[in-house]
Amino acid sequence: MTSVRDRTLFIYWGRRGSISEFLIELTKIADDGTLFSVSRQNELFGQIIRSGACIVPVDTFSRGFGAIFGLFRLSRIRRQLLAAIEKYRIDKVVVLMSHVWTPLIADSIRRTGARYIVIVHDASGHPGDRTAIVNRWLMRDALKADEVVTLSAYVKSALIARFPQLEGRTVVLFHPVIRSLAASGGARTGRPVGFLFFGRILAYKGLPLFVEACELLRARGRDFRIGVAGEGHLGDLAGRLAALDAVIINRWLDYDEVSTVLSQYDCMVLTNIEASQSGVVALAHGFGMPVIATPVGGLTEQIKDHRSGLIARRVAADASADAMELFVTDGELRKQLSEGVAKVQEDFSMARFFERLTEQRSEKAQ
């Protein structure tokens, strides 16, 4: 039996990244009982405002040191939120991703009687990610929450191992797809299969493994294209990528550029050496792209092996190369994977995610 939908306020105060797109997708399916608190400094703020959703805009900061020097704004932000909660009779506040300031307003929100829900994306920091240094502070948000939501069983397990007190109030949902479009059905006519490595270039993303896998596949005589798109340090990998004729876009891509880049490729490749779950997988599936990934973290929960993508046998260049070779050589498999991605778009839709979040009223977390 379907429960009554909670009147919900979603909070995301980050400036850029996949959660901005996550929020835009939520605004498309939100009902009249839904509010969104968004930073005016968000790179997609204009697009979010134009969505027509009910927005509670706040001023945060545009540079890292603003987290400290901008704290004087927090009192005003707190008043804005509490007024909105009262005016719209909000039942539930959902933090889509903790911000350095959200632990400071958690207690005030809970005192209104609204349930405070925090989505935890990572149980601990990722190697090479500078935001890892604030992970312990951000965890204060989860520890204050009435309920914690993770997007994979892997993260829930790691989170409870670190904070056993969260076991009774943590639930697992799923990472919804972003920008659902029709699956391509295989390689574009008249050109080789294209593989894309996408997103911020950080140590845990395993770009060296991707490059080595491509070198192995090229040595086997296979014809394919590759692209690398995202900001981060390439170092000596730049020369090796050039030797592979890779198309390199080594910077942050804006919203429209993402669509242009992804439309040029047939398969996303993740060669992570560590992962929680991945917004890149959610984006790829939204674009109808199968995903090849290493068997780490929650990636094996997002990607259904031989249904919506391929999971390499192990975290090694030759294993990734084997999976990529299978994708290149087996046209029937490519068609099968595209059909599987279409099913993922349905099963992991943002509409289902929104429904699950807003209908879980006051039930005890299982």
Question: What does each model-identified segment do?
Answer:
Residues 263-276, 289:
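Acidic donor-binding loop of glycosyltransferase active sites
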Residues 93-114, 276:
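An aromatic- and histidine-rich active-site surface loop
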Residues 12-17, 24, 28-73, 99, ...:
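N-terminal strand-loop element at the rim of the active site
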Residues 305-306, 310-317, 324-332:
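Conserved acidic donor-binding segment of nucleotide-sugar-dependent glycosyltransferases
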Residues 236-259:
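Nucleotide-activated donor-binding/catalytic signature segment of Leloir-type glycosyltransferases, i.e.
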Residues 20-25, 193, 202-216, 282:
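A conserved mid-protein helix/loop that constitutes part of the nucleotide-sugar donor-binding site
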Residues 326, 333-347:
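A short, well-ordered alpha-helix in the C-terminal region of glycosyltransferases
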Residues 144-183:
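Donor nucleotide-sugar binding/catalytic pocket of nucleotide-sugar-dependent glycosyltransferases
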